[in-house]
Amino acid sequence: TAERGSAARAEWRNRLEAHGDKAEFERRMAGDLPESFSLDTYIQSLIDEPQKVATRKASEMTLGEINANLPDTIGGSADLTGSNNTKAGGIGPFTADDRSGRYIYYGIREFGMAAAMNGMALHGGVIPYGGTFLVFTDYCRAAIRLSALQQARVVYVMTHDSIGLGEDGPTHQPIEHIQSLRMIPNLLVMRPADTVETAECWDIALREKDRPTVLALTRQGLPQLRTEAASENLSGRGAYRLKAAESPRRVILIATGSEVSLATECAAELEKAGIGADVVSMVCTQLFDEQDDAYKAELLPDVSPDETLRVSIEAGTTFGWDRYTMTKGLRIGIDRFGASAPAGDLFEKFGFTADAIVPQIMNKLNG
């Protein structure tokens, strides 16, 4: 058996050495991206032409660029392709009759999809990504945990990330899910706020060879907040100052995803009252936690709440946010199940408006 195996391997090595695609094969098996691959030009095009779209749509737009220029990707969805926006860039389905396809229709098999992607990532040569609703991560959590444990580069495209999905109601509206996923070691959980952050998050996920990524994406459209070019991938630091206070700073608003634009509205109202407010986009808590102490202190100075009040805003559980707001800070969130109604009505009902949040901040400052 050993002799046969040795002979077969030698024959395979000889074929590989003579093959014209040897370098490409070895690059892909090593998990390296092509040297020419970059999303910089695409991101600049987003900055040049701002648009209001859901981040699930922003992800589809980015995937159009990725799949057209990176042959390593193989996508799919657990029976929600049209909702997850995961099929883009001209890729066709992978079938028994056509194995050149790069898209898999997994059916209603969330755990099977996640487990299959783990296998593909561990084999090497491809970068698998797959989509479902964020609330359905409960169905594939064990496989997501193994992605992290086995250091597998898998990208989970999890859409409909909050009460913003609307009428499907509390069975489909994530509350505790984002924070519970953040608790898994070696798993990046990213919640981008607009088209630019979404593209940045995809770029990070593709370059993370030894850990998986969850992209938490909206159903509802979001305004584009990033309209100026940056010298680096700002999302790569996990969090960054999107807006600096104009008046003397009294408040730091820390928000994620769809609530970042709300934080900018709150900041504008506070400024009218002479209260300066920074807006920090917390794209990925894990990446932020990995930054050096100097950067973290620059963004979240270690001063008393009497000097600077920290406020977190996320349309999910408030559990865990005291890590960033400190115990005397203010945490805006949802600690109950959602409801069935249009997204705008739900955000108003659950207090996710500047009119509801700013008075809470003022009371805290004056308390």
Could you tell me what each predicted segment is?
Residues 76-77, 106, 129-130, 156-158, ...:
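General beta-strand structural signal in soluble alpha/beta enzymes
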Residues 69-73, 98-102, 123-127, 149-154, ...:
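Short coil/turn connectors at secondary-structure junctions
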Residues 81-179, 197-200, 207-367:
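Thiamine diphosphate
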Residues 34, 132, 281-283:
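Residue-level recognition of beta-strand->loop/alpha-helix junctions
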